[in-house]
Structures are given as C-alpha cells and as structure tokens.
C-alpha cells in the first residue's frame, strides 16, 4: 500500500515479490537456532503509550527476532541530521479541509477495511481505472469508494454499511479482480456500520467529535474508544497469556487526520507524541535491511520462500513487536542528537523508513489478516 504517496498513511499492500535474496544482503543470526532479543536490554523512553507498554514480554521472551541496539545508535548518528519533517498529506479526490467532517468520514471508513489488496494465491494486485487514471492497491480502494459516492451510493453512512450485501460491495469494488478478502471486509463494514448507525447517526465524524481530543484519556480518548467500541480496530495478540497491543489501523487513521487537518485548525490532537510506528509489512523489512533487526534461520527461510505466517503466531507477534520497539528506540536516539526545536516523534521515523523501503524487492512476511 502506498500510505505516503496519496492517501498518505492509510493502507499497506501485501504485495508478493518474486525476488530471490542475494547472499551479500543482511544475513541471518550467526548463532544457530533461536534469536535472542537483545544482549543488554534497553527500553524506549516512556511516552505514555499503552502499545509500547504492552511489548515488554514479547521483546524479552523473543526467540526468533533480535533488535541490535548498537546498530540503532549507529543509524541514528546519521539519520538525526536528515530533515525528518512532520508529514503534511493531501486529502484525496477533491476532499477539502473546508469540509473536515466529510474528510473524517472518508478516511475512517476507508481505514476500517484498509487491509490486504493482493490475492495471496494468484499474487495479483487489486487495480481499477477511475477519473482518467489507473490505481492499484489501497489507492484503488479509495478510488472505488469515491466512484461509489459519485454514483450516489451512501458508502460513508453507517446505516447503509450495516446492511450492505456482498453483491453490492462487490459492485463498489469492481476492478481487475475480486477485492481480496471481500467477505472479511463485508463483515467489518457490517460491524462498523452497526455501531455508527446505533450510536452516531451513521457518521464517523460524530464519533470523533464525541471523544476527548487525545489518543488516550482515561478511556475517553480516540484510540481508547475506537478499540473498545469497534472490535475491528482492537488489534491485539496473546502471547503466553500476555496481551500485546499493536493498534495499527486505529493509530494510522487518527495520524492521517492529524497530518492533513491539524494545521488548518480542523482536527485537534493533544498527544500525538504517544503514537508508535504502524506495524505492517514494510517497516520490518526496512529494519531488517538496515541491520537493526535479525531473524533466526527458520524465520528467515520462511519469509524468503513466501510461506504464510499465521496471524497471532509467535513469529508474527515478534516481527511486529520488534518493529514498534526498535522504531521507538531509534526516535529516542535521534532526539539525543537534535536540538530542542527539532525533536521528532515516532511516526516520523516510521514515515522515513516506509518512504525509502516500500518499493524494495526484498521479501516481506506474509500474513493474511484484517488488522493490517
């Protein structure tokens, strides 16, 4: 998915590369068997994030993924002197800051089904032609939603989404192939639409306005309530009885609204510094290629041979947990080298890594899931 190019941070394509890794690229752990987490445990600065706070067990008990703190320090020693700007994204398809409620509705509905856009069996991406251009991956999803709205389909109304049929949804997402995971997306829209219809007059902007203008605020923050009221956003995994929180899509949707609307005074968020990275497919690849993370031989082989890694498996949890852990450490090390007026927050590191590595031909892990 092209989260920064167009609708910015929304989405992540599960593209399958046919690339065969070269031996001179980052090697697996030299010690045979399992990976260790870190030789000497370091922990990111406390930013008040329940997501980071939940990672301790996953990091400390890791078997197959390791984070190299010394490499983080090394990378930070030069990355700190890059601009690393706060992203300012443009709203798509003529959406305007002049109508922030429509922007909120569009972004959050799209975010709710912003999952795999590649057919896992055929390795074919979802694509569509719209408005004189060719779109693929998540951009094709957004184009389809705009096309439906232009044709009078009330796709941003929860009352419609709660009852949308499979044929209707298939028509909305008419493209080169059937929308991947169409049935799962249908179930998500029914769930989200039902909550919106019953509690928020069918609109996501009513939900957003009813929340505290914070990510976390004693249960009334935007993320607090998204994961509580909309189960599809409750992106958590259990590892040996420990709950590990990731919250990729809820954080991503709110981050995009903040990045597009806050400068115009159309979206207030008082605690963006509590955001983590967005644990997806591409940022782990960036960390791997930079030598910040390393994998056991078994995991490395599974990824490089395009084996499906099950959702909620130890492998998947460790990959995502180390993504969040190492990017938080990197932000901290970068800030040690930057002046007070140029301090960054973790999503700026995420943006830097995703932008530079989303077109890499190095294989990423493959997990069929509605969570990212």
Task: Label each region the model flagged.
Residues 14-18, 200, 291, 334:
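A generic secondary-structure signal for well-formed alpha-helical elements
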Residues 250-254:
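Amphipathic alpha-helical elements of HEAT/ARM-like alpha-solenoid repeat scaffolds that form extended
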Residues 255-372:
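Accessory, usually C-terminal, subdomains that scaffold auxiliary metal cofactors
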Residues 5-28:
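N-terminal export signals
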Residues 1, 21-39:
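C-terminal segment of N-terminal export signals and the immediately downstream linker at the start
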Residues 31-247, 294, 301, 357-372:
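Phosphate/adenylate-binding glycine loop and adjacent helical scaffold
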């Amino acid at each position: 998915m092209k989260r920064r190019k167009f609708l910015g941070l929304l989405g992540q394509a599960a593209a399958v590369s046919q690339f065969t890794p070269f031996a001179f690229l980052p090697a697996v752990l030299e010690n045979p068997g399992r990976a260790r987490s870190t030789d000497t445990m370091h922990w990111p600065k406390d930013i008040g994030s329940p997501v980071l706070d939940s990672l301790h067990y996953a990091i400390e008990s890791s078997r197959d993924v390791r984070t190299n703190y010394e490499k983080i320090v090394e990378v930070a020693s030069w990355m700190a002197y890059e601009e690393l700007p706060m992203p300012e994204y443009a709203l798509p398809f003529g959406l305007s800051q002049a109508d922030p409620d429509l922007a909120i509705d569009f972004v959050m509905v799209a975010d709710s089904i912003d999952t795999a856009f590649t057919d896992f069996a055929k390795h074919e991406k979802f694509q569509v032609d719209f408005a004189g251009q060719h779109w693929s991956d998540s951009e094709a999803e957004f184009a389809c939603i705009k096309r439906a709205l232009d044709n009078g389909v009330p796709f941003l109304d929860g009352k419609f989404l709660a009852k949308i049929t499979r044929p209707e949804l298939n028509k909305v997402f008419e493209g080169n192939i059937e929308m991947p995971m169409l049935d799962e997306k249908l179930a998500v829209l029914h769930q989200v639409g039902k909550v919106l219809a019953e509690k928020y007059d069918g609109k996501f902007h009513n939900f957003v306005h009813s929340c505290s203008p914070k990510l976390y605020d004693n249960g009334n923050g935007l993320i607090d309530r998204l994961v509580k009221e909309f189960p599809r956003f409750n992106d958590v995994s259990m590892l040996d009885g420990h709950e590990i929180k990731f919250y990729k899509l809820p954080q991503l949707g709110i981050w995009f609204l903040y990045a597009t609307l806050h400068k115009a005074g159309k979206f207030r968020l008082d605690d963006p510094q509590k955001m983590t990275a967005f644990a997806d497919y591409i940022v782990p690849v960036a960390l791997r290629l930079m030598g910040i993370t390393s994998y056991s031989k078994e995991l490395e082989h599974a990824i490089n041979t395009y084996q499906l890694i099950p959702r909620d498996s130890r492998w998947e949890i460790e990959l995502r947990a180390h993504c969040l852990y190492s990017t938080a450490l990197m932000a901290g090390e970068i800030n040690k080298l930057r002046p007070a007026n140029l301090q960054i927050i973790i999503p700026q590191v995420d943006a830097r890594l995703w932008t530079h590595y989303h077109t890499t031909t190095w294989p990423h892990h493959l997990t069929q899931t509605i969570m990212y």
